Amino acid sequence: MASPLKILISNDDGVFAEGIKALAHEAARRGHSVTVVCPDQERSATGHGLTLQSPIRAEQADGLFADGIRAWACTGTPSDCVKLALGKLLEAPPDLVLSGINHGPNLGSDVIYSGTVAAAMEGTLEGLPALAVSSACFDWRQFDGAAVQAMDVAESALAGGWPEGLLLNLNVPAVPPDRIGPVRWCRPGVRRYVDQFDERFDPRGRSYYWLAGEVVNDFEAAGTGPKDWPTDVAQVQGGGVALTPLQPELFWRGALPPLPIAGVSAAPDAAAARG
């Protein structure tokens, strides 16, 4: 990059996670100014939730990172962390928001639940370039390759002109750096789960439920996006890096049936909706 960037980094795995340390250290190694604001504990699958009924506390955690990296551990959600950083903790707006490296994939429909993606999306909502990055295996603990991939993609995208409202979601296969495949634009795939709840009983015989389940990657589902792009699920399964463009807008742009309600006009066709 022509000049050092001001980078804000968050995650949903918490301040002690190895993934966020690898990402922060790689960004700092390249000469960028790095600030970490992330949850003080595991906050996975919190989506875009915010803390409204209790205070949010932030404690400095510089000692957990390399020299020169400023860090705060917050009691809130990933979205809280980015909001607090942008609204109170940072002296100036960052040039880039990064989230991750997540311990596990954020592919296809998983992004709806992901705190990692939500933290990056918070940056997008504030008009900032943002990238979420995940290592596609929960047990993998070698994050250096994913950190390099994330910074390469982010720096390249910024140099090329980052469109406003674009969130990049990067998933890196869990293999050694020299075996990581090529980066490709991907469309969101479909991931479904079976046997989602495990019923258990406490010592007093009362039942409780533990969210578990087994993921089923659906390679046949059409998904969304250009059909000549692979799905992110298929790309990572094949050993490549999946880069998926996302946006906060949720408006449906396909065809709609007429509503069976008096006084409501027929739905526009797909072409009109896209216009």
From Swiss-Prot:
Q: Which Gene3D superfamilies match?
A: Survival protein SurE-like phosphatase/nucleotidase (3.40.1210.10)
> Could you list the residue ranges that cross the membrane?
none
Keywords, in A-Z order: Cytoplasm, Hydrolase, Metal-binding, Nucleotide-binding
MF GO annotations: 3'-nucleotidase activity; 5'-nucleotidase activity; exopolyphosphatase activity; metal ion binding; nucleotide binding
Cofactor names: a divalent metal cation
In this chain, a divalent metal cation is annotated as bound at: 12-13, 44, 102
Q: Which reaction does it catalyse?
A: a ribonucleoside 5'-phosphate + H2O = a ribonucleoside + phosphate
Domain of life per record: Bacteria
Instruction: Indicate whether Hydrolase appears among the record's keywords.
Output: yes
Its cellular-component GO annotations read: cytoplasm
Q: Where in the cell is it found?
A: Cytoplasm
Binding note for cofactor: Binds 1 divalent metal cation per subunit.
EC number(s) recorded for this UniProt protein: 3.1.3.5
Give the Pfam families listed for this entry: SurE (PF01975)
Which Cys residues form disulphide pairs?
none
- Protein family membership: Belongs to the SurE nucleotidase family.
Task: Give the matching HAMAP family.
Answer: SurE
| Physiological role | Nucleotidase that shows phosphatase activity on nucleoside 5'-monophosphates.
Q: What is this protein called?
A: 5'-nucleotidase SurE
* Organism in which the protein naturally occurs: Synechococcus sp. (strain RCC307)
Query: What is this organism's lineage?
Result: Bacteria, Bacillati, Cyanobacteriota, Cyanophyceae, Synechococcales
